[in-house]
A protein has these predicted regions:
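Beta1-alpha1 glycine-rich phosphate/pyrophosphate-binding loop at the start
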Residues: 2-70, 149-187
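A Rossmann-like FAD-binding core segment of flavoenzymes
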Residues: 30-32, 71-87, 95, 167-260, ...
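C-terminal auxiliary extensions adjacent to catalytic cores
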Residues: 327-393
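FAD-binding core/adjacent interface of flavoenzyme oxidoreductases
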Residues: 2, 70-158, 165-168, 235
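Alpha-helical junction/boundary sensor with strong preference for TPR arrays
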Residues: 432-436
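A conserved FAD-binding loop/helix module that cradles the flavin
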Residues: 273-321
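Alpha-helical linker/edge segments of TPR/alpha-solenoid repeat scaffolds
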Residues: 446-465
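FAD-site-proximal beta/loop scaffold in flavoenzymes
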Residues: 111-138, 228-290
């Protein structure tokens, strides 16, 4: 009887696991994706949307399922019967599994009452409204905050840097970043901290480190030190809470404990990956690495000639700035990590040149290559690889010139009717810009891709595109 792997979730860890399993173990088993949504949102890139940059469109999971022979099952996992190997969804329906991977993510919750919590695509319009209010002179002071205990702080720096660029020159407009960190993006080490301090200074962002928010009142953000920070607009990152799956163990914050190979403690044949686990750093690239470790473990159990290596986290962060992106990389020690003691950094790099390829926001071994073009590529593409940083520094003017050239080539190719080449040029532009494009070109990419698919359908009837 064919073994069945059930993957619960529709985020980056779940999709990475699908790609990894098919790459490692082929198609001699069934994969079902138990998904509450049939689209993978590019959540990390959504931070750029309020500033006139278009995030890549959501990935259609139906296309992924068709391409890789995956069953797509509606539902949100709420309960696991470990002994009977049954996974139940909202409404009570149960699904059998031989191997279960829980990749359901975490739940973002408001961290500061009265502040605008930026969680992703759903909050883009609210940030756009704030920027419009500042442009009209109705608001002046933006404060971006990071809640205590937050380990993945990079989106706050992106919000502050791009907000400062957008409001530059507006009368009395100020941007302040308040963080409990000792240094900016301290999780990446000294190289990142120094690079961020310089960048924040260049963009005119006031930085307050080792500062914890107490509460927010009318136009004043109060710190635990008693200091008052003027703020008629406060943007905050959320707290994250675990999924609390009935039948599975969890810590006090409802996150699922796992070993280095992804196995859930005390639950044979059940693994977990991504933000749902107790690993303290909640970041897309790390979630894909956990998914890779879990997929290798499952592939080995299915009989594939795979050596299941333990999760060895390498943190890769692409900081969107509105100009040339900043690439950050650090090796983390996966042993003995706790929320109380933090982690030990083993290596730290910061560069204006790509430190991995393809240079996506979510640096997944299989997911990044799959999403690196306008049309998702096959598994024949080489997996993500790290790169040695260039010794030279990319200059903003050179970056903009290269980006403008790529966009011009895309327009010229499209005007000549060569849509495949136009899409290649946009892929190059997106790589230069950290995966995001000006909104107009993001819309053109969707239009050109639709036209190309229509042409293909017309010339090859009966063949799916």
């Amino acid at each position: 009887m064919t073994e069945r792997v059930l993957i619960a979730g529709s985020g980056v860890a779940a999709v990475e696991a699908v790609l990894a399993l098919r790459h490692l173990a082929g198609r001699g088993f069934d994969i079902d994706l138990l998904a509450p949504s049939h689209a993978l949102e590019h959540r990390p890139a959504s931070v750029a949307a309020p500033f006139g940059l278009g995030a890549p469109p959501p990935l259609d999971l139906h296309e992924l399922a068709r391409r890789y022979a995956v069953g797509l099952v509606d539902g949100r996992l709420v309960r696991v019967d470990v002994e009977d190997r049954q996974a139940s969804v909202v409404g009570g329906r149960a699904h059998h599994f031989d191997h279960l991977l829980v990749a359901v993510g975490a739940r973002p919750v408001q961290s500061i009452p009265g502040a605008l919590t930026f969680r992703g695509p759903a909050d883009v319009r609210a940030v756009e409204w704030v920027l419009a209010e500042i442009a009209r002179g109705h608001r002046r002071q933006i404060v971006v905050t990071i809640p205590p205990g937050g380990t993945w702080t990079l989106p706050a720096y992106e919000l502050a840097i791009m907000a400062a660029s957008q409001t530059s020159g507006m009368p009395e407009a100020t941007v302040t970043l308040v963080t409990p960190e000792r240094e900016p993006l301290w999780i990446f080490g000294e190289a990142a901290g120094q690079a961020l301090r310089e960048l924040l200074s260049e963009r005119g962002v006031e930085l307050r480190t080792e500062a914890r928010v107490a509460h927010l009142t009318d136009d004043v953000l109060w710190l635990e030190s008693g200091e008052a920070v003027k703020a008629d607009t406060v943007l905050s990152l959320p707290y994250l809470e675990g999924p609390r799956i009935s039948g599975l163990p969890c810590d006090e914050e409802a996150f699922i404990p796992t070993d280095a190979h992804g196995y859930v403690m005390g639950a044979p044949n059940v693994l977990a990956a991504g933000d749902a686990t107790t690993f303290p750093v909640k970041q897309g690239g790390l979630a894909t690495q956990q998914a890779d470790a879990a997929a290798a473990t499952i592939a080995n159990a299915l009989g594939a000639a795979v050596d299941p290596r333990p999760f060895a986290p390498v943190l890769r962060g692409l900081l969107l700035t509105g100009g040339a992106p900043l690439y950050l990389r650090a090796e983390l020690d996966a042993q003995g990590i706790s929320r109380a003691t933090g982690h030990r950094r083993l290596a730290s790099e910061a560069s204006s040149h790509a430190l991995w390829w393809p240079p996506g926001k979510v640096a997944g071994r299989y997911l990044a290559p799959y999403l690196s073009t306008a049309r998702p590529v096959s598994l024949g593409t080489e997996p993500l690889v790290d790169r040695v940083p260039s010794g030279s520094k990319a200059h903003t003017a050179e970056h903009h010139a290269a980006l403008d050239l790529a966009l011009l080539l895309a327009d010229e190719d499209a005007a000549a009717g060569d849509l495949p080449q136009a899409l290649h040029a946009l892929d190059a532009a997106a790589a230069l810009a950290g995966g995001v494009l000006p909104v107009a070109y993001s819309e053109r990419r969707e239009r050109w891709l639709g036209e190309l698919q229509s042409r293909t359908s017309a010339t090859t009837p009966g063949v799916p595109t």
